[in-house]
Structure formats: C-alpha cells, structure tokens
Amino acid sequence: MKQSARTTILTLWGALVTALALSLSITAPAVALDPGGREEALPTTPPPDPSVPSIGTTVLSDGTPVGIVVAGGNGGLLHVVDLNTRTLRSRERLVPENTDVQPWEFATLSNRHVMLASGGGQLFEIDPDAPEGQKATNLSDPSRPGYEQVAAYSTFLWDVAVDEHDRVYVATQSNHGGHILRYDPSANQGRGQWTDLLPGGVQAGESDVRSLAYDNGFLYAGTGTKNPSIVRINTSTNAATRLAVPSRVTAGLSHLERLQVKAGNLYVGTNVPGGVRPTCGGTCVLDPVTGAQKMKDGKALEVDTWSSQVVTRPGEAEKVYYTVQSHNTPTLQEYDPRTNTSRTLAQGLACTARPSQSSWATHEHFISAGKDDASIAIVHASDGSATGLPQDANGGNAIQGSPRDIQSLTAVPGGDLYASWYMTAPMLLRTTPNAQVDKTQYSLPQAPLGQVEGFGHSSKWFVTGIYPSGELVRYEMGASGPMLENHQSVRITPDARQARPYAIVPINDDEFAVGASPKNKPGSGALSIYDAAHNKIDTYPLDTISYADPSLRGLLSDRRPLSIVHHQGKLYVGTSASGNGMNPDQTEASAPRLFEFDLKTRKVTRVMTPFKDQRSITALTLGSDGTVYGTTGMHVFAMSPADFTIGRSRALTRQGYADANRSQLIERDGVLYGIMAGRLRALSTSLQDEGTVIADFATTPQGKAYVNSLALGADGSLYYARGSRIYRYRFPAG
C-alpha cells in the first residue's frame, strides 16, 4: 500500500523504524479472504426434452437399416433405431461426460460408419455395429495428424459432407472466420489427416460456413452472417469461385441454412422466421455453375418447402424430398424438377419432425425427428405409412434427453431456483433446495420454447429472455414464486435481430432494464426498458442511442450491453469490446465501455473506458455502500456513481483472464462473490488482494467444466452450476 509522505523531522532511530514499517506494508502479502464455507453438490438434475437438431442413417452389417438419433447435451445420448420394425434397438451415452455434443448434421461413409458434425466443435465417427461404449470415436483430437493446426477454426461445426473417396468436409464457425476443414480417414495408415481446405477462410468478414453440399467433384458452401453467399470449390485443385446468386435469394437472410445439389440443380434454403411466404416458397433452384435461377417454361423453379430442408434419396437420379404441412397434416413430399411439381409420398408424420440430409437410409426407409421434442416419424415408402416409436420397456419415451449444461440460473423469493440449459427447450428447471442435500426436489415446468439467456424478477413479475426469438416472457410473481401457467411475451425488436437478452435488471416493481445482443453476436446490441405491467418495450440500439453530450456520439457503436445495475434513476451498463470482442490488440477505440443512462431523459450521459486491453465488462453489481463494482474476468474494480470514476481496482494476476462472456457478481456483507475466468472467487470490497477461489472449474480428460450462473439463494447460500449439475456454497452458521 502506498503511504502519504511524512513532513515531521524524525530521529535516526525513528526513521529506521518507520522505514521498516513502510517496507513491510509494501512487500508483505495481504491475507486472502476466506469465507470459511463449504461446497455441496446437489443431486443430479433431470434432463429436459431431447435436443435433436439432426439425425443420421446407415445400414448395419446384417443389412438392417437404422436411424442414428443423438440427443444433444453433456456427453450426448445415442439411440439406434431399427427402421424395419420401427423400434428402439439400443440406447447409450455417446461419449464421456464434459464433452459438449450438439448433433447438427450427419453423413454416411462407404463402410457404413456415420460422421457427426457437432456444435461442440468435434467430428465424431459412429460405428453402430460396435459394442456398447465403443461406438463413437472423437476425431477432433490432437492425436490425429493435422488437428492441432486446424483446431482454432473449429469452435462450432455446422455441417458435414463426404465425397466419393470418403473424404469428409466440415463447415465451421470460429473467431478466425468460417472455414471448411477436410478430414481424410484413410491417410497416414488409417490415422487420418486434417487440413484447412481454403487457408485464410472461405469469405472475408464472415465467421460462419453454415451449409455444405457435394456433387461430382465440387463442394458448395453457404456462408453467413453478414453477407451470405455461395462458394463453389473444385476439390481436386481447391480452386474456389463465388457464385453470382440473385440478390433476391439471399435478401433478409442471416445465413444459408441448407444447400443441396442433385442432377445439375443447386437447392438453396431461403427460410426467414415469420409468417410470410419465404423467397421461392422456401427453396430456390439455381444453376450450380453460375448461380443463376433455373427456369422451366418461363417460370423460375421453386420448391414450397417453407422450412428450407431439401434432401436426396438413394436410387433417385433427380428427385428431392421435403416435409411440409398440407391441409394441417404433416406430409413427406417428392419434388421432380423435370416437371416442377411435387406429390405427397406419405402423410401423418410427427408435426414437428423435419428431415436431415441423410434421412433416407435406403430407397424404402426414411426417418425424421423434431428438434426440440424428438418426435420420430419413420416412413416406409412402398405403402406410404408413417409411424413413430413405441414407448420403451419402462414406459418412457424411446428417445430420451441427455443431461445438458446449465447456462442460466436465478433464485426467487420463496426459496426456489429456476434454470435453463444450453440449446432450446420447452421447459424450465425448477429446484427446491433443502438443508439436507438429498432432499432437494426438481421439476420441469412447461415454458415457451427457447434458450433462456437471462432471468430477472421483481416483487410482482418474473421475466425470462429467450433465444432465438429475442422475446421477453413475463409471468406474475406469486407468494411462492412465479405463476408459470399464464404468461405474455414481447419481442425486443420486431425482426428478432436483438435475439440474446443477457441482462435483465429490475428498475422498480413493474419496469426492467434489458441488455440484448444480436443473434449472431457481432454488431451493436441494444438497451431496452420493459414495462412488464403493460407488456410494452422501448428499445435503444447502441449504434443509434441518444447522447446528452453530442461529443460522445458513436462511442457505443458496435458494442453489446452485457451487464447492468440501477441506481438512483440511472443505469450503469458494461459492454463488450467492439466487433466480436476477441481482438488481442485492443485499443482505446475498440475497448469495452462503461456508460451511464438517464432513465428520465432516456439519453446516455457519461461514458468511460475502464480498461483498454479487456474484452468485456462481464458483470456489475451495486454494493450496499452505493458503489458500483464490476469485473472483466481479469480485473475487479469499484466505481463511484457520483463522480463516475474508478476509485480502486485489482488485477487478477493469478488464475484470471480477460473474458468475453457475461458473468455474475454479488456483494454480501462487504465481500464480492463473482464468477471470473470460470471460477467462483471471493474478495473484499476493499480490493486489497486477489481474494480466494472458493469453487474452481473441474478438469477431466474430456476438458474443463467451468463454474457459471451464480445466484444468491433465499437461504443465504450461493448457488452455481458446473456442466449439468447445480452446486451450492454454504456459509458457516452465524
């Protein structure tokens, strides 16, 4: 600690004593705060309904056609479905716990193995003939040649395609742009080989390659999110050409969700969420060489898929297939581009079931599944019959949900906790804690479909912010918690652009401040004021928000509000850095901001840059002393609202890092408890030391399970999650 200079004349001995004391005050380490509590693991949480974005198919060694249905989540749950008998053949965990499995697309190799592109960033090879516990192999592993050179490009895998040589292509999303990675399973004596097909990325400025299709030596890639386009790649030379796609095809799209190519036709999905007919009815038919729209008899070829999902079928040279509601009946349709007509192949499919690119296992057998309820539809084409799966031997659903990582958590008056998971679900997790851990109770009340990004509540209202619809859903608060039976909702913006309501903070009993980010994250977010009593919202995008001082204009552009506190008629809001928040060479111009917003004038009144080298102000809280405390994951700071200055700060040189994601910070009895760098840390509001890690992340061979979603329970304990499990930190009695 720095001490003030002395002005008195000291004796020599006094000077020596004083110098020694001063030296000790500077060099002696501060004693780290230890709350003296203990961590308790609550019982295993029940999984929500299955998350099944896509399914695969293959044929077993004995000739049996099967569906490969993976429920996404923590480790995933693999179901093998017999398509002949329409029964469940087996169910087992796909891979070990702490592996994030999100089954976005499948493709089948000539050896009948199934490749799974996972949103967790892995490529899995599945052999359904293998013994239990040995069916899946994670190919995204440093032991595979070339993987370490491409790992940074595979944060998320969206799609997968294979060529006639069994080379596998995956579409990726990363902070280094969207890439196409190629995996050759036969290279290096069967050890495989990873390569980056187009070094430098597919399209400058795009973080995603969203869709792939392969045909006759050429790979087609659909990009997003700023300027969606289609790239045609010669897989022999890796020469890439951007197709001249008509602007009407991509107008209004944030990405190209589905491509399919068959018999000289390139099918491009154009579905935009909403109630209006999408361009081309959902799928445009283009020339795969030029990108021009295909015509027949003077009319553009269009397919009324609505959902953009077009798939091919073994043994069919030209026709493609899709599902659609016809006269309120879910049907499987066959489209013939030679006549530009469709016919019904089967009726009575599950209403939420949608096809995947490998839905046809054979010319006879088709399977589809509902993304958020795993409602299965199995079609036998010869008789046009469509049926689901019977219940399993225990009377439960044949397709069951996998444990999923908890990503949002809140505590409400009355003692209950409410949580939501990564990936959308039509329910919430309600937890009723008990002093005896084994008496904790769980339930899964129904709620609007979505991924809850943030919770907020007052004495009168309980509010959830859900992705991808960008809606706020409000419920009345009862004596024992929210009354979930009745709810109303409102979109933050009519076009659902602001799709991630991360921060929801009460202003008074009826009003909430909301900080939202765009669906695809880069770009400006928005600050909203939500009137729950009247279900009305006023939204202020940060790129057009009003300033009391014109000289501040533009300082918040290209940033997203991640943390908010309310104090005496003002909001204090912490933002991300500009762009995607991942710039390692952050400058003053691109750094995260802390700003003050006047609720009366609805204008930004003050803006500061606390740290230019950080990625986000991930959490803010109001202390009992009226001080605003915040963190970036690497720094903790105290800000005085009166003069809008940083009074003190502490760099977390041990076990800290500059985080980009929102977190939580709570002040209790002069101690800050916050999630920083994936750990729960306790430190004094004096910020004299780095504090103590009271709950660390868990390390397993599959990876780390970070601490997240902190809440202060009605019982005075801290509750938080690691993976799919909830924990609490109990303070000493008294």
What positions do the PLM features span?
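Conserved beta-propeller blade signature
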Residues: 66-70, 113-116, 167-171, 219-222, ...
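Residue-level signature of beta-propeller blades and closely related beta-rich strand-turn architectures
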Residues: 71-73, 120, 174, 225, ...
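A short loop-to-beta-strand structural motif that recurs across blades of beta-propeller domains
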Residues: 77-79, 122-124, 179-182, 228-231, ...
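Blade-level signature of beta-propeller repeat domains, shared across WD40, Kelch, NHL, RCC1
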Residues: 703-734
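An edge-strand/N-cap motif at the start of beta-rich repeat modules
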Residues: 33-90, 368-369, 386-410, 417-419, ...
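Surface-exposed loop and turn segments in beta-propeller and other repeat-based domains
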Residues: 43-45, 92-98, 137-151, 193-205, ...
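Repeated scaffold domains used in trafficking and secretory/extracellular systems
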Residues: 49-59, 99-107, 150-160, 205-213, ...
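Short, conserved, GDST-rich strand-edge loop motifs in beta-rich repeat architectures
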Residues: 271-281, 514-525, 574-591
